[in-house]
Structure formats: structure tokens, C-alpha cells
């Protein structure tokens, strides 16, 4: 079961990355569970899909694109989820994912239940 949960969580982050790289803020927000808290340092804290979608739309409108992940580590979190940590780069910035909690939902997909990341610099 754990390997299946991990593969489902990996499919979730892949879907998020594809929607971001397609400049689809609504698609990005759909990868978050309802009521999720996203801590985006240094920008602030955003709660719920509506606020999260607006944040990503603003980032996209500023020309940020082409996100990629490196140094990805997955740690089991309960029986139905994983914690992800990673480094990330975009065309205009780079940073780290401090903690993403990907958890299986009732529809069988994994979505973010918590997201904390940081922009560490410009490129």
C-alpha cells in the first residue's frame, strides 16, 4: 500500500508542475485540498483554493514559469500521505520546499494538505 500511496503523491506533484508550467493557476489550485494553508515566504500565508489560485495567477502574470524540482525527498506521513522536501528553480527565481504534505483524498487522488516554500533568490 505504501508504494501505491507514494506513486499517487508523485502523480500529484507532477500534475501541479505540469499545470504551473502550462500557466494554469486554476489547475495549480486544484492540486490543493479544500482549506489547505500555503505558506509562501516571504509573501505570506494563503488559505483555501481561491487565495492560492490568486497567488499563483499573480506569480504567472509576473512572468514566472518553468518550475523544476531537485533534491526531492519523500517521507511517509501516516498511512495515506507523504511529506515532500525539495529544492526548486524557475526561470526567474529559486528556493526550497520546506514541507509539502501530499495526502490521499476521497476521489483517490493525492492533494496538498499543507504547503510551505521559500523564494531564496532571483535568477
Regions found by a protein language model. Name each.
Residues 1-27, 37-123:
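A beta-strand edge to alpha-helix "cap/lid" segment located at domain peripheries
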